[in-house]
Amino acid sequence: MAAQFYERNTSGMNADRFMTRLTDESTVNTMQRHYWTARQFIRTKLGKKEDEHLEASDNELDTCLNLYRSVHGTSFQLLNNVDNYANFLLDETLVQNVLGKYLKEKGKIDKTEAVGRILIAVGRSLLFSSHRLNAARIGVSTFYNKLSVFVERAIGDCSQTIEAVQMCRTEYRGSLLWMKKTSEELDPEVDGSMEKFREAQTTVKSNKERLDRLKTDTLQKVDLLSASRSNLLSYVLTHYQNELYEYYSKTSRAFETLAENINCYNNYDFEILSHLATGTKPERERKSEKEESAKTSQPRGNEEELKNLLFGRESPQFGEEEVQDESRSQCDSPLIEDVDDERRKTGDLLDLESAASIAFPIGPLATLFDTSSFVPPILPPPKPNAVSDDILSLFDGNKANSSGKEASATTMDWQSLIDGFDRENEDNLL
């Protein structure tokens, strides 16, 4: 069985715990023991290296202490996170409840019958979601209470044992230093040297016995602490997981029923705020196919109860009205009209007005060119022999007159042709 506890036959108070030690030891031995304990404590704080054999004997205890520190730190972190999560769930529940009541009140006073029913339905769905979320929040609160009790009692009790075993190990190592010092100064011929060594040896033995008992208690308590926390988490989180799954399943079915009932109403197209259009909706055929595939993958239950809960007697007949197929896409907001359609309409109107203002002639088209008109031939280029290299030939009057007559005749032929072409074009245009 487990070893006796280190506070056996005592009331647990500090004065009663050390009463036997005060009566058995002398004042000098007590002062020496405290001196070597303080010296060992200072060595530990300064990071002095201990004997490797002494450290190897405490490997199991060090592993147990590391496990305790991990359980202690993670438990406090988990407690803080669960507290924050419970507060966030409470805020979300209150927001959904207030928003649901607000939508119900506005739906009752709305002048449009369809919009009023939709607002009432959405408000009821939000109230239903807030009630289910509040039920899931109760599980989180229960988890927080049980975890706080575990941290306060189990970890608090184990921390006392950890502190005791660490203090006892410091005293034991300090007594070893004391015995090492007395053994180096041991001289059988000197009076009182053997008594000092026996006192140090007795202190080492008593500290070793206490340390062994505390090691056993520490190992058992830390193992039990880790196992108890695992059992607590598995038990509480299983209930929370079931409540969370029930919340999501019921709220999802409620919102699916709400969407089905809202789709029965006709959409309203407004001609304002068209400049805010940012995108288009998917086609109704694709949307209906996706909804049907999602419906077939998840079975439904108690749809009539959810309809009655959300809509009451104001629920429209779902399934009787079929939505007409629309080839064109609609904008995301019901208050926004498609910008492309509006531009196309305005462009068509402008084209019609400009076309109506132009008077087109009725009858056969007029001819633009007369194929029977005379086209003068192009004169061949001058021969190289016609040009004389002699400068005196330029002053020849006969040749100059003949070339001038030919150039003037060619110019007159081209001028008459251009004038005749301009007259024909003017007649056709008139």
From Swiss-Prot:
Function statement: May be involved in neurotransmitter secretion. In association with the GTPase activator protein tbc-8 activates rab-2 during dense core vesicle maturation in cholinergic motoneurons.
Alphabetized SUPFAM superfamilies for the sequence: BAR/IMD domain-like
Name used for this protein in its record: Resistance to inhibitors of cholinesterase protein 19
GO MF term set: protein domain specific binding; small GTPase binding
Chain residue ranges for the region called Disordered: 279-342
BP GO annotations: dense core granule maturation; neurotransmitter transport; regulation of locomotion involved in locomotory behavior; regulation of neurotransmitter secretion; regulation of transport
Lineage, broadest ranks: Eukaryota, Metazoa, Ecdysozoa, Nematoda, Chromadorea
InterPro entries xref list: AH/BAR_dom_sf, AH_dom, Islet_autoAg_Ica1/Ica1-like
Organism: Caenorhabditis elegans
